[in-house]
């Protein structure tokens, strides 16, 4: 059986010395939302708890202001 290389998880916000996550930064927020619109948990992304809380708050604000969708497009 082949072993797969697992990349070490790290917090991108800590590495870049981000003080606060902005809800208007849609490009960054989209990286932490799934196609179905769910917030990706920190155990998958490697984000620290402090930034995960800020991230969740920013995503929820962006959704409320219609900058991010709550769900994906429902094409029929």
From Swiss-Prot:
Pfam families according to UniProt: Ribosomal_S18
GO biological process: translation
SUPFAM superfamilies: Ribosomal protein S18
Keywords tagged on the record: Ribonucleoprotein, Ribosomal protein, RNA-binding, rRNA-binding
GO cellular component terms, semicolon-separated: cytosolic small ribosomal subunit
Source superkingdom: Bacteria
Gene Ontology molecular function: small ribosomal subunit rRNA binding; structural constituent of ribosome
Keyword rRNA-binding: yes
Family: Belongs to the bacterial ribosomal protein bS18 family.
NCBIfam families the UniProt entry points to: S18
Entry function: Binds as a heterodimer with protein bS6 to the central domain of the 16S rRNA, where it helps stabilize the platform of the 30S subunit.
Subunit structure: Part of the 30S ribosomal subunit. Forms a tight heterodimer with protein bS6.
Protein name: Small ribosomal subunit protein bS18
Organism: Aeromonas salmonicida (strain A449)
Gene behind this protein: rpsR
């Amino acid at each position: 059986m082949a072993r797969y290389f697992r990349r070490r998880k790290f917090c991108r916000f800590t590495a870049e010395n981000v003080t606060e996550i902005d809800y208007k930064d849609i490009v960054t927020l989209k990286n932490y939302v799934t196609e179905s619109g769910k917030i990706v948990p920190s155990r998958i992304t490697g984000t620290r708890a402090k930034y995960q809380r800020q991230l969740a708050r920013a995503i929820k604000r962006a959704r409320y202001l219609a900058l991010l969708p709550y769900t994906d497009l429902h094409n029929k």
